[in-house]
UniProtKB/Swiss-Prot annotation:
Enzyme class: ligase
Entry protein name: Alanine--tRNA ligase
Annotated spans, Disordered: 512-535
Family from the record: Belongs to the class-II aminoacyl-tRNA synthetase family.
Compartments where found: Cytoplasm
GO cellular component: cytosol
Length: 977
């Protein structure tokens, strides 16, 4: 069999099905669009789920793709087996109501034998237990009955991907790799065939006959149209065609391993055994024990090479698709992969960050097929480096933790390291189970694999549940027709009441979701409530009204719900919030006057000013998203947003904080788009047509068959159901108030648009004015003439000047006011520092020259007959102040030894000086200071006539000074004190 490269195999497959009239569809992101039930894209069919179920109009009936996939279900064995990877490419061909079993089997066999070059006589197949039809087709294609195996649901019923979707029985192709690949009993038992746990038969092609749609409850329903979903692992096919032992020996993965060999200086094909041989006497045999130990080292290093090779691909492709390391969800999986690779890297002598160093080389292998990697290379490299550095800071803590857990286990007289402790290390410190097992084995402990697996399964279940759509109904049993939304073109309109709900004081029933909503959105009353459907609502009652038509926008897409009034004559209902449940728009509020009954026609009036501000901020959010993707790169993905009347908040994926210059560029880009006054155009399109426009979708959102697309010239095009301005010029201006981080791998921008920009600058300059006035007042009152030079005399605009300049100059005034406010704020900070410094200098000068202080210190003098010794302790005085006071004391008194100390909140300092006469009598201040500093737990030194020092043991300051006095007395008098 002629070996073929991975890229050649990929092209052979895609071209084969292209020639069979299949649409070649690019790989979708690893972040599953519109399917929150999946952490990652795990199969080629994920992007086609709506086509299989008939949820959308078919753009084609045949497709083929090579899909990026990520699965971590077998993470613990990755690197140890020949075929397991977390990241892999899945070749696939798909039929949506077009061909079925006959053609799918024909294509699989033809491509495998006549295009890949597999020996037909070595191909075995499996079919589902009762799938006689599939077996009959295989027989007709020349596969003998003895090479056809029937397997049950566990092996031959596939799907769905996620909690719901298309699924059905499947048929798999295996290649017989020879009896030598079998297990110890395979050669003699005669039962070895597909389904055996050995490595003899390797599955390389799976044909799923999609006949059912599984709902979220696990029930199967016949599909309106049958389909074909094929999966063929590219790495596995390469393993077989290149006739190597594992997927890690295929050309692309082996190349990545070679990068790590070069970086580590260790060979993947470990030479440890031969090295030991050379060290031995030529005639001396290597013992069995040495061989076993050496083999263990070889296997350990080989596993480490495979783990880092697999994980760098997974991490690199994930970050390239906007999945950043995080504390929860899919981001946590990526973080765990980085940490696992870092740990295994220690077996290859990597003690410092190393994964990031090879990002560019790995991208070089894949960039032709996946250009997004090259575009996001800088972000990928930086993110991985940051994560490695972060983990290395906690790694030593983890190793200390495992040591303490081992000691705790032994102290309790146990010989088994518990699964719960192992999972603690796994989840908190990122320690893989196998590494924990190795470490505890070195300490003579067994490892509780079962207990660990139980804890792991609990965690997996929690992870799965946390990603399911867990939507609690606002109105239990609410089943009404769709509310027609009028709000795109109007802020008022008429609608008839279809449902009324009243929240009465809570009975013994549990509090429903609507009660929580009503309590949070109405000011009336306190305590708990129960909600019930009623035929009328009366004055003073809080509740909810559902209309058949309304201009009120329900909270969604980050935009908060509208408020306003529902009226009919003297009947008035104040709306505090608007929400959506299924297709019904619900108005929450309180009856201010009159009575409301079902079927009544109401006049609905949205609060106009608030809606306008929402439009400014929602359109501004789209422009901000466009700016970020244009200036920072396509790796930027929306992670969350809030659109309120007061401000906008936008969370996005990005590995590092933004520089001041980047913030200015983003702000200028948005303001330039506002100035260009682009028309804001909206279209309702099929999901497929919408994707063709290049519109940006919010990953994780689930879209219906038809979506609304909002375009703003060439600045932005997004899927969006919110309310917007007609032209970007209406926004007026945009200003970034704050940039921060909501979590690892993500950044957050808070900004304002339109009138909110005016108000923001008015408030900001008002605060600056107050700060300047307060500082100037302090400077004048506390420094007098000394402070004249640091008075702030900057021009600060008033509210009217700010409004006039912004309204006259528009977006260009934003930069002016940003720079001015930052300059004034900097000036305040600098001059406050100068004020405190001058104030301190004046205080020190006053202290040094204070007659009362000098007199008090001199009054405490000790006369030795040869000279006097004075000492004192102060609070919060620096050494310079103490030196200044010492000099003034020596002016007042001859033959004087001065010992002064000071304490602050952290440490103590001490200064020793003496008159020149005393140095002739044997006093050496530099020696005396060492006596003091020993007690203070610090250091010091100096000349015979002056020395200084200090230490952290401030409580010993009195003892330190007393020790110096005693030593000085002994020197001067010759008497031991």
């Amino acid at each position: 069999m002629k070996p073929k490269s991975v890229s050649e195999i990929r092209e052979i497959f895609l071209n084969y099905f292209k020639d069979k009239s299949h649409n070649v569809v690019p790989s979708s992101s690893l972040l599953p669009a519109g399917d929150p039930t999946l952490l990652f894209t795990t199969a080629g069919m994920v992007q086609f789920k709506p086509l299989f179920t008939g949820a959308v109009e078919l753009p084609y009936t045949r497709a083929t793709s090579c899909q990026k996939c990520l699965r971590t279900t077998d993470l613990e064995v990755v690197g140890k087996t020949e075929r397991h990877c977390t990241f892999f490419e899945m070749l696939g061909n798909f039929s949506f109501g077009n061909y079925f079993k006959e053609e799918a089997i024909e294509y699989a066999l033809d491509c495998s034998v006549n295009h890949f070059g597999f020996d037909k006589n070595k191909i075995w197949v499996t079919v589902y237990t009762d799938d006689d039809e599939a077996e009959k087709i295989w027989l007709s294609k020349g596969i003998p009955k003895e090479r056809i195996t029937r397997l049950g649901k566990k092996d031959n019923f596939w799907g769905p991907a996620g909690d719901s979707g298309a699924c059905g029985p499947c048929s798999e192709l295996y290649l017989d790799r020879g009896i030598e690949k079998g297990g110890p009993n395979c050669a003699t038992s005669g039962t070895c065939k597909p389904g055996c746990d050995c490595d003899r038969f390797l599955e390389f092609w799976n044909i799923v006959f999609n006949q059912f749609n599984q709902d979220t409850e696990g029930n199967l329903h016949p599909l309106k149209q049958t389909g074909i979903d094929t999966g063929s692992g590219l790495e596995r096919v390469a393993l077989l065609l290149q006739e190597v032992d594992s997927v890690y020996d295929t050309n692309e993965l082996r190349k990545i391993i070679s990068f790590y060999e070069e970086l580590s200086g260790i060979s993947y094909e470990d030479k440890t055994l031969s090295e030991i041989s050379e060290k031995k006497n030529n005639n001396q045999q290597i013992s069995s024990q040495v061989r076993n130990e050496t083999k263990s080292i070889q296997d350990s290093r080989k596993t480490a090479f495979r783990v880092v090779t697999d994980h760098i691909r997974s991490v690199l492709f994930s970050i390239g698709d906007g999945i950043y390391p995080d504390r929860t969800g899919r981001g946590y999986v990526i973080r765990r992969l980085i940490r696992r690779a870092t740990l295994f890297g220690r077996k290859l002598n990597f003690k410092e960050p190393f994964l990031y160093k090879l990002v560019d080389k790995v991208i070089e292998i894949y960039k032709a097929r996946y250009p997004e990697l090259q575009r996001n290379a800088a972000a990928i490299t930086k993110t991985i480096l940051v994560e490695e550095e972060l983990f290395l800071k906690t790694l030593e803590l983890g190793l200390e933790k495992i040591e303490s857990l081992v000691q705790k286990t032994k102290a309790g007289g146990k010989t088994i390291f518990s699964g719960a402790d192992a999972f603690l290390l796994y989840g908190t410190y990122g320690f893989p189970a196998e590494m924990t097992e190795e470490i505890v084995a070195e300490q003579g402990l067994d490892f509780d694999k079962k207990g660990f697996q139980e804890e792991l399964e609990k965690d997996r279940q929690f992870s799965r549940e946390s990603w399911k759509v867990n939507k609690v109904s606002l109105m239990t049993g609410l089943n009404v027709d769709k509310t027609e939304f009028l709000g795109y073109s109007s802020v008022s309109g008429k609608g008839n009441i279809t449902h009324l709900f009243y929240n009465s004081p809570k009975s013994s029933n549990s509090l429903s979701q609507v009660d929580s909503k009503l309590q949070s959105s109405t000011p009336a009353g306190t305590g708990s409530y129960d909600s019930k459907q009623v035929s009328s609502l009366k004055e003073g009652q809080a509740g909810a009204i559902v209309l058949n038509k309304t201009p009120f926008y329900p909270e969604g897409g980050g935009q908060v719900g509208d408020i306003g009034f529902l009226r009919q004559g003297k009947n008035v209902f104040k709306v505090f919030d608007t929400q959506k449940e299924n297709d019904s728009i619900i108005h929450f509020g309180e009856v201010l006057s009159g009575e409301f009954i079902v079927s009544q026609e109401l006049e609905a009036e949205v609060e106009i000013t608030r809606r306008e501000r929402l439009k400014f901020h929602h359109s501004g959010t789209h422009l901000l998203n466009g700016a970020l993707r244009t200036l920072l790169g396509d790796h930027v993905l929306q992670k969350g947003s809030i659109v309120s009347p007061e401000y906008l908040r936008f969370d996005f994926s990005h590995p590092s904080s933004l520089t001041s210059e980047e913030i200015r560029q983003i702000e200028s880009w948005v303001n330039e788009s506002i100035r260009k006054n682009f028309p804001v155009e909206t279209k309702e399109l099929s999901i497929e047509d919408a994707k063709k426009t290049g519109a940006v979708a919010t990953f994780g959102e689930k879209y219906g068959e038809r979506v609304r697309v909002v375009q703003m010239g060439d600045a932005s095009i997004e899927f969006c159901g919110g309310t917007h301005v007609s032209r970007t010029g209406e926004i007026g201006y945009f200003f970034i108030k704050k940039e921060s981080s909501p979590g690892a791998g993500n950044r957050r921008i808070e900004g304002v648009c339109g009138p909110a920009v005016i108000e923001t600058f008015q408030n900001r300059f008002s605060e600056l004015t107050e700060s300047v006035q307060n500082l100037n007042l302090k400077i004048k009152s506390e420094l007098g003439e000394e402070g004249t030079k640091i008075l702030i005399l900057s021009f600060i605009p008033g509210p009217d000047e700010i409004r006039e300049k912004l309204e006259k100059e528009g977006a260009s005034a934003v930069s002016f006011f940003r720079d001015l406010s930052e300059n004034i704020a900097t000036k305040i900070e600098e001059n406050t520092s100068s004020f405190l410094k001058i104030k301190k200098n004046l205080a020190e000068r006053d202290f040094e020259n204070n007659t009362s202080v000098i007199e008090n210190v001199l009054a405490s003098s000790v006369d030795t007959g040869i000279g006097k010794i004075v000492s004192a302790i102060f609070e919060d005085k620096d050494p310079n102040s103490l030196k200044g006071l010492s000099d003034n004391l020596k002016v007042r008194e001859k033959n004087l030894l001065v010992i002064l100390g000071s304490r602050n909140s952290e440490n103590a300092s001490i200064v020793i000086t003496c008159s020149s006469e005393l140095t002739l009598k044997g006093i050496h201040c530099g020696n005396l200071i060492k006596t003091a500093c020993e007690l203070l737990g610090g250091k010091g030194g100096g000349r015979p006539d002056m020395a200084q020092g200090g230490g952290k043991e401030k409580q010993n300051l009195e003892s330190a000074i007393a020790g110096v006095i005693n030593e000085a007395k002994q020197i001067l008098t010759g008497e031991r004190v």
